[in-house]
Amino acid sequence: MALPILLDCDPGHDDAIAIVLALASPELDVKAITSSAGNQTPEKTLRNVLRMLTLLNRTDIPVAGGAVKPLMRELIIADNVHGESGLDGPALPEPAFAPQNCTAVELMAKTLRESAEPVTIVSTGPQTNVALLLNSHPELHSKIARIVIMGGAMGLGNWTPAAEFNIYVDPEAAEIVFQSGIPVVMAGLDVTHKAQIHVEDTERFRAIGNPVSTIVAELLDFFLEYHKDEKWGFVGAPLHDPCTIAWLLKPELFTSVERWVGVETQGKYTQGMTVVDYYYLTGNKPNATVMVDVDRQGFVDLLADRLKFYA
């Protein structure tokens, strides 16, 4: 039986490719997709979900827009990474359908209530929508199997020296998620920076030759340009968000550890930092499965294989 998942995202090039991977995988049953502000403004990220589902001919999936700003802060967006639209590069179709007439949290709650089995929440943007769901619907916590997030880092940040972007946008929300008591799986920069797509991988995807693989290659063409900056020291572009979906499909591609994770919300230099108790120094029981390594070639092969689904 396919694993029921609820995807909360802020497309974003890598979010878009996570959607592509999830919907090409019969092992997963995508019950709904909600959008959050983050990589772009809330209006643009919602539109990008609708555009991607139109491209993939999956207008049957319920979609709802989420919080327009973090719980306690002003919104920060990553338009320098993802462009004016949030998905700059390819020519994507206009949305062929409308979102549900409800909020992201309402759609999430409805999805959980109606599911016969616990649902896995996959969150690849700021954690605002998920935190609002957890705070407003404690009676539904038992309907959540786990929360798989792209966010955080044990080591270096990518938005500040200490913080990864998704967590930095709304650290208070991320702290709610990590301390919720629900199993959390963290795909942080320690693993996603190893999940790099090289130019030759992009050409491999393009050569598959279907409309979706072509769009994915064009998304990566744009994403690769930003990551050419020598400060990163990358060979290619880190494909952050699809690591969450790949972990659900093939966890054997990843190395992970069980550790306690907290989020710094006050520090002068460290706001948004995910504090991972790697050496068990706090005495706190582990609350997260933290990915630390990936079989890069296996990850690329998985994506290439699933892109053939769209032939």
Curated annotation (Swiss-Prot):
SUPFAM superfamilies for this protein: Nucleoside hydrolase
Gene3D superfamilies: Ribonucleoside hydrolase-like
UniProt key word Hydrolase: yes
UniProt keywords, alphabetically: Glycosidase, Hydrolase
CDD domains attached to this UniProt entry: nuc_hydro_IU_UC_XIUA
GO biological-process terms attached to the record: nucleobase-containing small molecule interconversion; purine nucleoside catabolic process; pyrimidine nucleobase metabolic process
GO MF term (any one): purine nucleosidase activity
Catalytic residues as annotated in Swiss-Prot or TrEMBL: H240
EC class: hydrolase
Entry annotated with the keyword Nucleotidyltransferase: no
EC numbers for this chain: 3.2.-.-
PROSITE patterns: IUNH
Signal peptide: none
InterPro entries (alphabetical): I/U_nuclsd_hydro_CS, Inosine/uridine_hydrolase_dom, IUNH, Pyrim_hydro_RihA, Ribo_hydro-like
CC terms in the record's Gene Ontology section: cytosol
Family: Belongs to the IUNH family. RihA subfamily.
HAMAP family with a match to the protein in the record: Pyrim_hydro_RihA (MF_01431)
Function: Hydrolyzes with equal efficiency cytidine or uridine to ribose and cytosine or uracil, respectively.
Protein name per Swiss-Prot or TrEMBL: Pyrimidine-specific ribonucleoside hydrolase RihA
Organism: Escherichia coli (strain ATCC 8739 / DSM 1576 / NBRC 3972 / NCIMB 8545 / WDCM 00012 / Crooks)
Upper classification of the organism: Bacteria, Pseudomonadati, Pseudomonadota, Gammaproteobacteria, Enterobacterales
This protein's encoding gene: rihA
